Amino acid sequence: LMLLDRAEFCGAEVRRGTEVAGPILDDGGRVAGVVLKSGERIAADAVIAADGAHSPIKRALNLVSQHNGYAAIAIRAEMSANRPDVDSLDVHLQLRFRGDQLPGYGWVFPLGGGRVNIGLGYVNSYRKWQQINATQLLGEFLAGLPQEWQLPSIGELMKAKAVRAWRLPMGFTAWPPWRPGVLFAGDALGAARPASGAGISKGLQSGLAAGECAIAALTNGGPDDFTNYTQRVEAAWGKEYRRGRWFHRLVGVPAIAAAGVRTLDAVSNPSVRARLLFWEQWSDPETSPHSAGPGPES
C-alpha cells in the first residue's frame, strides 16, 4: 500500500481492487493494452506485466522460456510469541522429509509488538517435493521451536486463516523478458533469486528497469522491440542467475544439501553464516542478508 500511495502521489492513476483478465492484441499480435475482469479495455503504448506468478498476460501469450520450472514452495504464518523483540532473522537449516535433508530453510522473523513471522521454504529441485504436505511440515517446524514461546499450533493457525502458502517462480521464467508491446517484471518475470528465493528487491528493481526501458524504446523506436530490456536484465543479473540455477539443481540432491548444512553449521559467525546461506549476495552489496529468503522478503 505504501508503494501504491507513493505512485499515486507522483501522478500514477491507481485502480484499487482491479484485476487484469488478459492482454489486448492488435492485428499483428502485439500487446496493445489490457482487458480488466470487469470487461473494461485499456489501451496502452506499452504494458508492464507485473501481474504475479500466475500472470494472465503471460498465460494468454503462451510464453515458453528455457528457464521454466525453477520454483520454490513457501509457507508462513504471523502470530504472537512470548519472546523478546529482536532485530534479527533466525534461520533454521534442519528441514527434513522422510529422512532427507530438504534444500530449504525455516525462519523466525520478528515483526515487533510481540509478533513474529514464522515459515519455511524449499526448492522444487528435490525429487519428492510434490509429496510434501507443506502445512504439515510447518506444523512440525513450529512444534520444534522453544515451548516457552507459547506459539499457537498449526491447527489453531489454520482455523484463524493465518497460514499463507505459495509457489514462487524464480530464475527468469519469462525469457526473453518481453514480447512486442509488453515487458514482464516481478513474479511474472520469475525475478526471484533461484537459490535463496529473495524476491521483493528483484521485483522492485525489475519493475524500475522495465519502466525505464519502455520509455527509452518508445522514445527511440516504438513498442515492437524491447531488446534494451533483455540487455539491461542480462547485464545486471545474468551471470548471477545462471550460477543460481545451477545451484538450484545441485541442492536438490539430499546428500549435497546435507553436506551444505554441515558446512554452514561449522561457521560460528552468524553474519558470515547468513552470507554463505544467501550466497548470491556476495555480489550484491545493496542487499542485506537479513532481508533475504522466500519468507520475510517475498
Give residue ranges: language-model regions.
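FAD/FMN-dependent oxidoreductases across multiple families
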Residues: Y126-C213
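Active-site/binding-pocket entry motifs
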Residues: A81, G114, W166-P169, G190-A191, ...
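Short secondary-structure transition/capping segments
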Residues: V64-H67, I118-R127, G197-I200, R262-E280
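Generic non-transmembrane alpha-helical segments
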Residues: M2, R6, C10, A209, ...
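Conserved N-terminal/central alpha/beta ligand/cofactor-binding core
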Residues: L1-E19, S271-E280, P285
